[in-house]
């Protein structure tokens, strides 16, 4: 990590040096050239009312809020699909930056020929909301693609790269469409809000500032409020609903669009979003599920999302119960997982010469190690757990923890 940071800093310095050199050459080559007076009016056909400009500015702020909130939520969700938080963040960042670049480039080819810019901005926002809610179910349904990779030759030295590459490309493909749409919003708002050539810098600077400020609040609210209060799946639906509402408001208040066209567009897009949201919530299609869970799970017994992790208890096809954190099975009734907890409790105390020691455990899991420690003459057991949902799942494993949470010598520290 440190070396990568040094490399990034060095590249930034090289870029800065190259820009200074190019600027110096440009100044020398432009000496003696008489500046041309620019046209004052930007594009007469693009002129919109000040009310529409204000609406567009509010929309880009709320759009920035939704975009960065979705980035946080998708990063959290992709940990299940990519099995690695670093890969998840890298994939999301790649999708966002590539999508913004492609979206801006695509809309730039048509923006000067469009008349109803407020309507088109609203349509883009509605599509962002719809595709944002579809992203996680589409990723979840791509498990057969990953199963095909899993059946490849395990002796292939390139298998880890192929495995990671397949998941990266699949995820990038799913996330690219909503991020391309997000990339279209800034040029449209810039076109609406910019009135004359003389005010291009001021207008675009204001649009960029409002969009960035919305993004700051979006990332903070998603991580510190939405996930703890609603969980990831409900937060995705809430943010997608906000995106859709932004689009509906813009379409309804666009004076350049016929009233019938506005009503039909709003009714169709709003109805589609409501149907999708209700279906996915009812069917549990937005539940975060890793490849291992989807292959092994026969029945989900408990599912709880929190700010630290998503904790799930499920029964596999052999009838065993497993506890998974962010998609990784960490404890359960299978013989291998159960036996792995016993040495954690017994070995240190069998070797310790301290009479009646105070014992500290890091991580509760299913509670097997905590119960094992209490079988010895210990004064107290302090167990430190970072994820509140983990001890909440203890009720599903009485055969492992034997009700250790109610033991007077046991102290759970959150």
Regions picked out by a protein language model, each given a short descriptive name:
Residues 1-414:
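Alpha-helical transmembrane segments of multi-pass membrane proteins
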């Amino acid at each position: 990590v440190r070396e990568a940071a040094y490399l990034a800093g060095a590249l930034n310095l090289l870029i800065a040096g190259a820009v200074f050199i190019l600027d110096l050459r440009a100044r020398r080559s432009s000496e003696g050239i008489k500046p041309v007076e620019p046209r004052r009016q930007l594009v007469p056909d693009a002129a919109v009312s000040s009310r529409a400009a204000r609406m567009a500015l509010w929309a880009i702020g709320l759009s920035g809020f939704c975009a960065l909130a979705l980035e946080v939520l998708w990063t959290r969700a992709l940990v299940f699909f990519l099995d690695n938080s670093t890969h998840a963040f890298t994939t999301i960042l790649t999708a966002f930056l590539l999508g913004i670049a492609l979206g801006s480039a695509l809309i730039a080819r048509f923006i000067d020929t469009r008349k109803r810019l407020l309507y088109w901005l609203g349509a883009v926002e509605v599509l962002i909301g719809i595709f944002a809610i579809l992203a996680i179910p589409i990723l979840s349904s791509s498990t057969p693609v990953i199963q095909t990779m899993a059946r490849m030759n395990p002796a292939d030295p390139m298998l880890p790269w192929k495995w990671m590459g397949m998941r990266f490309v699949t995820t990038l493909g799913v996330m690219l469409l909503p991020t391309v749409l997000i990339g279209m919003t800034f040029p449209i708002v810039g076109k609406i809000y910019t009135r004359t050539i003389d005010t291009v810098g001021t207008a675009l600077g204001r649009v960029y500032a409002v969009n960035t400020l919305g993004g700051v609040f979006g990332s903070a609210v998603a991580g510190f409020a939405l996930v703890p209060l609603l969980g990831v799946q409900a937060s995705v639906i809430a943010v997608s609903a906000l995106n859709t509402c932004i689009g509906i408001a813009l379409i309804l208040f666009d004076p350049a669009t016929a009233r019938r066209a506005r009503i039909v567009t709003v009714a169709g897009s709003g109805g589609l979003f409501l149907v999708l949201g209700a279906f996915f919530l009812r069917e549990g299609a937005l539940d975060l599920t890793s490849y291992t869970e989807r292959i092994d799970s026969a029945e989900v017994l408990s599912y709880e999302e929190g700010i630290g992790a998503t904790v799930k208890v499920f029964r596999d096809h052999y009838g065993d119960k497993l506890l998974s954190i962010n998609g990784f099975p960490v404890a359960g009734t299978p013989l291998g997982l159960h036996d792995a907890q016993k040495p954690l409790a017994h070995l240190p105390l069998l070797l310790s010469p301290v009479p009646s020691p105070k014992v500290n455990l890091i991580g509760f899991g299913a509670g097997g190690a905590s119960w094992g420690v209490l079988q010895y003459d210990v004064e107290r057991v302090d167990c430190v757990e970072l994820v509140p949902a983990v001890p909440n799942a203890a009720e599903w494993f009485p055969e492992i923890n034997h009700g250790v949470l109610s033991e007077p010598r046991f102290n759970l520290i959150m």
